[in-house]
Design a protein with these regions (language model features):
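Sec-dependent N-terminal signal peptides
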Residues: 20, 35-49
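A composition-driven surface/loop motif
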Residues: 2-30, 52, 61-381
Length: 381
């Protein structure tokens, strides 16, 4: 289709990227009478995003303009390329089918439905996100990415954020989304973030793998893998909810693998693994609850820290800790380290139907396993 009459090369949809100072969540400083909690939890993956079905064009919700590969198209007229690799309805719906090109950006709401194999990549030294929804003059940003088939694939690469929304962001469907950022976040939402469906999400960032300033929900039967470099694997500015029975793997080189400001809730048969090479594995200023799910946490000196306490209910939790240099450093229930190679036994009182046990003597990083068959409130392990 011919979209040149709808082309406009000025305005914020065509502006170059912004230099992104890494938005980092600070590591929580322990307060009160106890310090970081040591814990390991085997967990399953919940992955793939929530994006809701594509909505019909609506003036109230439509994008004000989009930019595809450096060319701006204004709302009201459909646009696309002759090969059919991308098509925009002039409102809020865009389809990708074999797209291999540059930046896709919108002001306002944008629903992206991808089919087949698609690649979005920024040019060298471009300081903006590869796929981005930002606030417009009158419309708030919202980005929804979805697929229809398990063979669908979306690959996004950038020096800055790979996928970003200055509002809410959702990923859903059975397809695969791979994001790579060399200097920033793999996926970032300034609002809430949701991943739903049965697909796979792989997010790798030079700072965070996956980050939201609001609530993060992973309600998926698929797989979500998040890898952070200088930042967290998964970071939530509010609550982090993992459910749906899938697998979630979070890794970080320097920070905690999983961080949430308000609390972490893992349930529904989900399997979660968290591994940090430089800090504790799971960190929250709120509480941690694991219900009918598993958590496996590996960190340095500490496995899990939940400032407002931990609750296990029919959960399996495994924690492994090691001192710098990889030397095993067993931790006692009070949070102090011990030179003994024997993992200390659990000394906390438990409900009759709950079971907490230590693993046998080992010279490898310290490991603990907690198995509960009823709700077990704990302040720390």
């Amino acid at each position: 289709m011919d979209a040149r009459h709808n082309m406009h090369r000025t305005g914020s949809c065509t502006e170059g990227g912004f230099a992104k100072a890494s938005a980092r969540f600070g590591v929580v400083t322990a307060q009160g009478g106890w310090r970081k909690v040591t814990w390991g939890v085997v967990a399953g993956v919940a992955a793939v995003a929530t994006a809701g079905s594509l909505m019909a064009p609506s003036a109230a919700l439509a994008a004000e303009c989009v930019n595809v590969g450096g060319t701006q198209y204004n709302a009201g007229t459909a646009a696309g390329d002759d090969a059919g690799t991308w098509a925009w309805d002039g409102a809020d719906d865009m389809k990708l089918n074999g797209y291999n090109g540059g930046v896709i950006k919108a002001e306002g709401k944008l629903n992206i439905a991808y089919e087949g194999k698609n690649t979005v990549k920024t040019e060298p030294d471009y300081t903006g996100a590869a796929i981005k929804a930002q606030d417009g003059t009158s419309q708030k940003a919202e980005l929804n990415i979805t697929s229809s088939n398990s063979t669908d694939e979306l690959n996004v690469t950038a020096e800055a954020d790979a996928i970003k929304s200055t509002g809410d962001l959702s990923i859903s469907g059975p397809g695969t989304v791979n994001t790579t950022s060399t200097a920033s976040d793999g996926i970032e939402a300034k609002g809430d973030l949701s991943i739903t469906g049965s697909g796979t999400v792989n997010a790798m960032g030079g700072t965070e793998g996956i980050q939201s300033k609001g609530k993060t929900t992973i309600d998926s039967s698929g797989t979500v893998i998040a890898k952070g470099g200088e930042g967290y694997g998964v970071a939530a500015g509010s609550d982090l909810v993992i459910k749906g029975g899938g697998k979630v793997e979070a890794n970080s080189i320097e920070e905690a693998a999983i961080w949430a400001k308000d609390g972490i809730n893992i349930s529904g048969g989900s399997q979660v693994k968290a591994n940090s090479e430089g800090d504790l594995a799971v960190d929250t200023e709120g509480s941690l609850a694991v219900t009918n799910a598993s958590l496996d946490a590996s960190g340095v000196e500490y496995g899990v820290y939940a400032y407002k306490g931990v609750t296990l209910d029919h959960a399996t939790v495994t924690v492994r800790t090691s001192a710098s240099g990889g030397q095993a450093s067993p931790s006692s229930p009070t949070g102090t380290t011990s030179s003994s190679k024997m993992v200390p036994s659990w000394t906390r009182s438990q409900k009759e139907s709950s079971q907490l046990r230590s693993l046998p003597e080992t010279t490898s990083p310290t490991s603990r396993v907690a198995i509960s068959t009823s709700a077990t409130p704990l302040s720390r392990l």
